[in-house]
Amino acid sequence: MKKILYVASKNPGKINEYKKLLSPVNCRLLLQPNSIEVIENGMSFSENAIKKASEVSKLTNNYAIADDSGLCIEALNGRPGIYSSRYADNDENRIERILKELKGEENRKAFFIANVSLCDPYGKLVLDAEGACNGNILNKPRGNNGFGYDPIFEETTTRLTFAEMNQEEKDSFSHRARALDKIIPELIKIFY
């Protein structure tokens, strides 16, 4: 029987992404129970990821994996950063706010960053990794795939937005995939 690994999130889209990215790992992925509420009040992506994984693992008595990620824009001194998901009330308004704040700004350099943390059933941190993806913020959205800031984030090497990429292409560049790639060998050992 496969060991259970909780994904510390209530987002059904996230478990689908994790299923694909963690396909080499012999585990059964489940979303955290709806009854668990974790307040993300850390001062870094790493603190938030560790807190989510630790709380979910202790409350479920199972391993839990969590990530915290966001968009950091050079001209905005790293904003929205750890507040990326709370920068406005929905994706459309978040994009609108970014574009308004960057209006007339020539420096459009940005990067997505993700911290991924795994905690054991006692809430102890076992694995932690960071991944990043460099790009630029466009003047207007482009593409129909993805979510969040994907339509305005143009990846540096392909010159495509994440919203113009299919999931397989996005996975090869994504900050979350890069962070998970760093810990997959250890995850395989834990969930043998």
Residue ranges with predicted function:
Residues 2-6, 13-192:
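Anionic-ligand binding patches
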